[in-house]
Amino acid sequence: MIAAVYTLFFFFLLISSVYSKATISISPQTLNRSGDIVVIKWSGVESPSDLDWLGIYSPPDSPHDHFIGYKFLSDSPTWQSGSGSISLPLTNLRSNYTFRIFHWTQSEINPKHQDHDHNPLPGTRHLLTESNQLNFRFAVNRPEQIHLSYTDNINEMRVVFVTGDGEEREARYGEVKDKLDNIAVARGVRYEIEHMCHAPANSTVGWRDPGWTFDAVMKNLKQGIRYYYQVGSDLKGWSEIHSFVSRNEGSEETLAFMFGDMGCYTPYTTFIRGEEESLSTVKWILRDIEALGDDKPVIVSHIGDISYARGYSWIWDEFFTQIEPIASKVPYHVCIGNHEYDWPNQPWKPDWAAYVYGKDSGGECGVPYSVKFNMPGNSTEATGMVKGPQSRNLYYSYDMGSVHFVYISTETDFLKGGKQYSFLKSDLESVNRSKTPFVVVQGHRPMYTTSRKIRDAAIREKMIEHLEPLLVKNNVTVALWGHVHRYERFCAISNNTCGERWQGNPVHLVIGMAGKDSQPMWEPRANHEDVPIFPQPANSMYRGGEFGYIRLVANKERLTLSYVGNHDGEVHDVVEILASGEVISGSDDGTKDSNFGSESDFAVLWYIEGASVMVVGVIFGYFVGFLSRKKKESGVGSSNRSWIQVKNEET
């Protein structure tokens, strides 16, 4: 017995001595801001395995299996020598980082320990080495994740940002970059782990301190003027100076970028899959914003399934860091989706919706969404948690140029007799069509889609029964939806039937193609290539498999929507609607397979005053996109006859 104990002791001593030879270093040990790169180097890894991995931890005392993310050492071309390096851009999580290297082999894979995509999570049995701590300069104090939104007042702009502490902050702003004399005091709020509804959001695996969210309203703005601003305090430090163009009530022009279901990319593997295509969406929209020049107000509209954090709170930090180059320049408006709100005990869950609303929020139940954004209006609903804050940003509206924009919630009560229905009815009936001849309604789950997702059939039926009569009666121009991760444009439709071009029924578009990739290509059956799995019905004018976004441009006479693909940054589909409601292009005219002109052609519509600038931007953007693109789905976006089978979204 004693001999066996000694044998076991010396065995573990031997294993320890083998594994203890590894060393790790990081450079630099202090980063300035989110997005800065750290280089992690290691050496002395004995008998390296292609499953050896680098764990990323914040805060530094996190248990081994509570990583932020990981990278396999085999990502380094020299890993087989036992040495290598990996470069990572990091986001400021308001706490320090450490990095740990683990040895892992095929024989140690636990098939029951899986991530969201059913891939095995890495084993933590054999720790080889751990780095010193890495910190961000002014990590707690620095304001980050800056994003703008409109308020209910035409002469205001809201700015929201995050810091590590709740001490006093403000926004200072002005018309001259070095003369920011106007002050707006910021209000700080936060949420806690007990406000979350279930795991992983309320578990130690998914929870990280979200910091303080500050909200300041810049008031008394002149209309159509570029303002400069920064946020922070003299005591704690200031952000960089950003700028925006204020709303202009006298302008007839409306410019917007619109999409759903974008998410964000992470430079590491984590418990849930990141959305690599979201990088291209941000890149092309940023190109378009910069091409507009200095005097045009623009909005971004993200209609649900925002970050796809699903209970892993640091993903919200990654998301806001990714969109800050856009959202610090133009208002970033949102509506709630299933991955922000849904949980099993949500207050409104009628019998017909028993299989519609699940646990897609990962236990967040609308709390981070409600705290991190502040949209116009004052719509609220209870989360269903005794301690939880109310859900906000559910339904609201505002005017911009010639368009009245309306946002609704498909995750909370929208039936006749409810608060949201009353809001929508009153709002649509009170639109001044001489001022805003176009009305655009947006929500997450689609009223119309050729997806055969059985789980959502009941909600589509209820939306057509309760909401569609309001849209038709009040001559809504366009209805935009997400949730299905593809682009699809319908005719001017009512009760599943196309009307005449001049009748003025709403044109419905599904635009959930900004990043989420959980749905594969619609392809014909192998033994029946002439028969698509989901045939395109007569009321579906165009279906596209290319990731991308929508551009909206409108004046008093005409509204144009263009579908821009991420692969090439070019326009793949266009629909134009007159103020009378007549659809004058993009109708069912026998040209379903055609594109509606090149990017330079669209520039004439989109940037009438700056076509030459846009053409240069397109050429530059095309080559940047081509060079930076790592992968491309074969045939995607080339024709609407290359069908894509829409599978059920992950549950």
UniProtKB/Swiss-Prot annotation:
Its main location: secreted. Keywords: Glycoprotein, Iron, Metal-binding, Secreted, Signal, Zinc. Substrate binds at N338, H483, V484, H485. The keyword Disulfide bond does not apply. InterPro entries: Calcineurin-like_PHP_ApaH, Metallo-depent_PP-like, MPP_PAP, Purple_acid_Pase-like_N, Purple_acid_Pase_N, Purple_acid_PPase_C_dom. Residues 1-20 form the signal peptide. Zn(2+) binds at D305, N338, H444, H483. Binds 1 Fe cation per subunit. GO terms for cellular component: extracellular region. It is found in: Secreted. Expressed in roots, stems, leaves, flowers and siliques. Glycans are attached at N32, N96, N202, N378, N432, N475, N495, N640. One of its GO terms (molecular function) is acid phosphatase activity. Its cofactor is Fe cation; Zn(2+). The keyword Lipid metabolism does not apply. Fe cation binds at D305, Y308, H485. Belongs to the metallophosphoesterase superfamily. Purple acid phosphatase family. Homodimer. This is Probable inactive purple acid phosphatase 9. It comes from Arabidopsis thaliana (Mouse-ear cress).
